[in-house]
Amino acid sequence: YSLVFILGLPGNAIALYYLSQRKQRARSTNVYFLNLSVVDTVFICLLPFRIYYHNTGNNWVFGDIACRITGGLFYGNIYLSIGFFTCISLDRYLAVVHPLTYRRLRFSHYPLVLTILIWMICGAIVLPLIFGGPLNNILEANRTSCFEEFSPRSWHNRLVPYNVCALIFGFLVPFTVIAIVFPLMARKIGKIRKSIHRTVALRIIGFILTVSLICFLPYNITHLFHFLMRLQFIQKCSSSIIIYKLRRITLALISLNSCLNPLLYFIPSQSWENNILLFICFQNEQCRYCKCCTIFFNTATNS
């Protein structure tokens, strides 16, 4: 967490300024980038609370309200990040596989609608948990935990619905979408002659896939086993200890995405879809969009 805070704060501050100053702020990709950068910046600014919590032997001293706010934002960052990764993947999929449709949609209201939908889904997952009651628990040795070590009653009454929704919308749906669109994108990109545009496209694909596999997948798999353990499907004491330790490690690992994401924002991503559209049109002599391609080519050349 300390490493993420040291590296992530200046990186996200620079990225946030860069994204807010870009001329194409209304473009779909930039809308998702900007939201992702805001989420990461807020998340990193709250990391000192978690750092202090772990350095004092997992003893929360900031009170219940601070526990709810920081805990809710911490876990909300997980779902918002993977949600906007999914939006970026869909955006790149449209740009690669359906470029003409993409050009009609990228300046329309659909990026804003998707962004609002992601925030609403995250709020529907996290807010009931935050407002459902205290999230700090006084344990032995006068130690207070935050967002962990809940009683069996709290787990069944409050955390089962939360975890089911988190696993569906924070894991199954996003990873299914990413797993489907990436092969389709890679197949289409493979048909394009080697150029800087192809390189940029592959970098975007590779970055999102790498961060998803390194940061998000281990946590969600561990979270699934932790969920099964709390429902007593896994009862062996040795297995429970391993799952608990792995969950701590993967929670720290998932925070790495907040200091890695600024690298994504600076990948040149403005013009490579032009090459894809021109390739699709000019490869087909009977292309019914020839007039559209000619206009688009002239526009791209002049710009």
Q: Language model features by range: what are they?
A:
Residues I138-L139, R143, F233-C237, Q270-S303:
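Intrinsically disordered regulatory tails of 7TM GPCRs
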Residues Y1-L3, R25-I88, A95-S108:
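Extracellular TM2-ECL1-early TM3 structural module of rhodopsin-like
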Residues Y1-R22, V42, T176-F182:
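First transmembrane helix
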Residues H54-Y79, H98, R103-R104, H109-T115, ...:
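Loop architecture of class A 7-transmembrane GPCRs
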Residues N142-F171, P183-T222, Q232, S239-I243, ...:
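Intracellular effector-coupling site of seven-transmembrane GPCRs
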Residues L3-I6, N35-V38, P48, A66-I69, ...:
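Hydrophobic residues within alpha-helical transmembrane segments
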Residues C45, A124-F131, L172-A179, L209-L228, ...:
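Hydrophobic alpha-helical segments of membrane proteins
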